[in-house]
Curated annotation (Swiss-Prot):
Designated name of the protein: Major capsid protein
Domain of life, per lineage: Viruses
NCBIfam families per the UniProt record, alphabetical: major_capsid_P2
UniProt family annotation: Belongs to the P2-like viruses major capsid protein family.
UniProt keyword terms in alphabetical order: Capsid protein, Virion
Proregion positions: 1-31
Compartments (UniProt record): Virion
Bilayer-spanning residue ranges: none
Amino acid sequence: MENITRELFDQYISRQAQLNRVSPAAVAAKFAVDPTVQQKLEAAAQESDSFLSKINVFGVTQQIGQKVLIGSKGPLAGVNNSTTTRRNPADNSKMEPYDYMCRKVNYDYGISYEQLDAWAHQPNFQPLISSAMARQMSLDRIMIGFNGTSYADPSNRAANPLLQDCGIGFLEKIRKEAPHRVISNITVTSRDEDNKIITKGTYGNVSAAVYDAKNSLMDEWHKRNPDNVVILAGDLLTTSNFPAINAMSQTNPNTEMLAGQLIVAQERVGNMPTFIAPFFPVNGILITPFKNLSIYYQRGGLRRTIKEEPEYNRVATYQSSNDDFVVEDYGNVAFIDGITFAQPENGG
């Protein structure tokens, strides 16, 4: 670490101590991040990613409790102007699971001395450190949200490179708590580069599968929700649309313009806005509003240690947060779990 980096880093440590109302020495030990600072860190993490900025990130007081947003059993409006028959308010909360449980997840982060030396010549040295940690925390949460299937202690990153054992994510919650909202193992008609059918599948195309899933799995009052979107992997969208794009390129003079319109982010699948999410399973499709997905973190539950590790030529930040990944209303969910393109029998 260069001398100028040393001076800036010491200032960073002093600032962290000041913000969290602890001594500089305590920063290198274990300390609880001040709830106000934690909220700012969460906001920075959410703003650092376009997907997280669209869903909810809620701070909750209790580690275990009821969801912040309770699903609806349906419409409540009615008419009763009688003077003899009383109006009867009904409980409109869903019967599907509505509890959450925040569990400890480690988001440890190391920054090399070399990287710090490079940042030392930037005017925003301290924000660069904070932003790097916030960004990685965001990516890890998205990865767990879409791939997490268990909570193992200890977790094994080598065996679970997508953090499958660091928590139960959105998709696994749907599988376990609302299996009636899931269609599994379907096929889509496969086509060649000229858009000619190779093998017929359960559905003619991805849009047809999405349309059927929405209309057969969602509660009636959610099917036409204007906030519904399609969330999938870029691989599936590209594979699905390539034959159509290629066919247009051979028959339409406005090739580049039309092809560009097909692959822009605003492209609609199943007549709904489509969002390509990082780390989303390549064989899955989720239909739901963004605001039906939430990450809960426990206020006051963020623990942190920032210390130098010269034996590894780095500064290490050891931090843990109590988190949960929540689907607020299962009635506004349709999940296709296992979608592939039909293959010819006997591989021929």
